Amino acid sequence: MNDPYKAFCDDFYVNLRLGSQLNLPHSRETLLHFFERVQKEFPNMTRFRKADNGDLNLEEDRGNHSYRWAAIEAKRLAAGHVNPASIEEALKLHKLMMQLAPYHLGISPVEIDYLDILFGFDLAFTGNHDEIISESMFGSSPLNCLAEEGGARAVDFQPTVTVALTEDCRLQARIDVVTRTNSYQVRTGDYSEDVISVYLILRRYWGDHPKEPMENMIEEMATRADELCSSHIIPRILRPISNAIASRS
């Protein structure tokens, strides 16, 4: 599963999210011990910070093209690898997080709500993001009918689609397209360089309390996500968006 996405985006990342129905522990000793254990495996993760909302983050230097990060939120454990050399490389941190969670944070399968694997793609563009999505994603769709009105300008085209991949609906896949221009920019033509983001999220709900180790599930979900990207996301979403951006350069 080598990274095949460089030709279609400026940044690619693989994120992990483990949601709990209970608050995660936030005692000083527990948190420091957990982050020290992560740092032992990834010595370049040296930047520790606490956000205003109480979230705790340990990360590598974001100034580098490729970097890792890990976070403990109120009810969620999260991690990410931006521009990994391969999918396998990104999963090293994620598997470690799942191995440590039960023993260092006391996370029990009983409390788990969901497990997410997110493949993210950022495409830089200075201009009307929503216009790009309107043209590349909607085209002749009936949902694009308002764009046919005289003087109409796209200001909010952010589609999201979710499907169940299993009969019990516990494994679901979602596509989110996120734009970052606003009405002021459309009105004035004063655009700043920002990114259009495309997310493919595989979510495994935990109601049946699966017995398989979480690190194995992560690898299976990442493999499925990679297959979905090859068969659907690249040819039907990333390539049309990239072509629309290139047509304006």
Outline where the language-model segments fall:
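Short amphipathic beta-strand starts and helix->beta connectors
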Residues: 1-2, 62-66, 101, 180-186
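Glycine-rich, often proline-containing surface loops adjacent to acidic residues and nearby aromatics
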Residues: 8-18, 68-83, 111-120, 194-205
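A common structural junction motif
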Residues: 39-42, 98-105, 229
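C-terminal structured interaction module
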Residues: 197-249
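Internal, hydrophobic cores of structured domains that mediate oligomerization or house catalytic pockets
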Residues: 72-145
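Short, conserved charged micro-motifs
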Residues: 21-30, 88-90, 208-215
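N-terminal low-complexity, intrinsically disordered segments
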Residues: 1-74, 78-80, 245-247
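Aromatic/basic-lined ligand-recognition segments
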Residues: 115-190, 199
